[in-house]
Amino acid sequence: LAACLCLAACGREEEAPAAEEIEEGVVLNVVTSYGVDDGNRRNYETAVAGYEAATGNRVNDNSSVSNEDWKSRVLTDFMTGSEPDVLFYFTNVDADPFINAGKVVSIEEIREEYPDYATNMKESMMAVASDGKHYAVPSSGYWETLFVNRRVLSACGVSIPGPDYTWDTFLEDCRRIKEAGYIPIACSLYEIPHYWFEFAVMNNGSLAGHMEIPVVDDAGVLVDDPASRKWIAALEDIKELYEAGYFPDDTLTAADAETVAMFGNGEAAFLIDGSWKLGYFTKNFARRIEDYVVAYVPGKGQRPASDTVGGISMGYFITRKAWEDPAKQAAAVEFVFHMTSEEVLGTFVTTEVTALVNGTETSGLSTIQQSAADANVHITGLAEAVQDAISGEAKSELFINIPKVVTGQMTAREAVEAAIRRN
């Protein structure tokens, strides 16, 4: 089948770029973060099925839920020559190892053969690599914020947080929730402390300076500056919450899925997570969906609760291996074209950020989706995650040591210094 197969997109026909004939029955090896527990897994499966039906090709899907182990496996596959044909992955420094190794193809190079590739995306919203080129076609974006279980809050006499929610009020709410016999914060410090760290950093700094990163001197000693001070203070805030007993009793051993279930089942009041959880709760906790509300992470210092974290952090890469395979090149291009078309991305986007030139239209939002849309109206500032601006090794070191910090085995300063030494 020709790579110029027409695909409908938002009520009009968009033609996929064509340079080569797609070999009949091509099998594409694809890796994404749309694992079985991802809220968009069903949308992903539907989109892949649509590609297979339209092209006659088959997708060998090796998707898994995104975490540090998954990232490590992806990078290891590139190192051993086992990389996929198409990869849906982070577009920040996490992608530097395989970009710098020449293992993926730039959009600029692809456009030499397929001029219309990714032209439905805003150039300004596509990630730029250190060489000044673009490599990933962006998918739907994200936001991170506070999810609340309104049933738990009601039982504890606590109000749903608004855009003026403060840290002091939050601490008082946590005290009341704990005294009422509920878990204040659903979080696995063992597996996913990421979200609490991100907002704790912003709470000890500002939106404008959020992307500032600590540094070490030539001797490997952490430099005392505003960036290092706010990172240290962030870890100390998390330690304060731990010592107060506001996390689950097994926060240092439980998996993220277990603590999220505590929130979903009405055992815990608060959860910081991302926009992808809208689909997750709709799929896995449909009977309780009315209990969940998207609210605001408590603000502290210069940060109001209406400043949040968000952006577009992931996209589709075509690997050099697929590009240089005559049997797979056009099939890989067609796959990315299909997955990032307005029609397909429209199924992934409800309240998320999008790079699509024409945007998407949504209707018939569920109660939790509508609460997200309502909360987003009050957003006063948006910053990308600063943790995504440090190396994978530095990030792993930082988050592995958070349990040590909260239990007093390591100081917050030591943890930040150890992480930045690996940056």
Where are these regions (language model features)?
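Conserved N-terminal structural module of periplasmic/extracytoplasmic solute-binding proteins
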Residues: 4, 10-96, 100-101, 111-114, ...
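Hinge/lid segment of periplasmic solute-binding proteins
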Residues: 22, 90-148, 168-171, 196-202, ...
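Extracytoplasmic/periplasmic substrate-recognition and gating elements
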Residues: 26, 32, 49, 53-54, ...
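Conserved C-terminal helix/tail region of periplasmic/extracytoplasmic solute-binding proteins
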Residues: 59, 154, 345-346, 354-365, ...
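A structural signal for short loop-to-beta-strand junctions that line the ligand-binding cleft
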Residues: 76-77, 84-85, 114-153, 174, ...
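Short, solvent-exposed loop/beta-turn-alpha elements that line the ligand-binding surface or hinge
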Residues: 108-120, 162-163, 205-233, 283-287, ...
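Extracytoplasmic/periplasmic solute-binding protein
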Residues: 130-139, 144, 169-221, 239, ...
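Glycine-centered hinge/linker elements that transmit conformational signals in sensory
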Residues: 172-176, 217-252
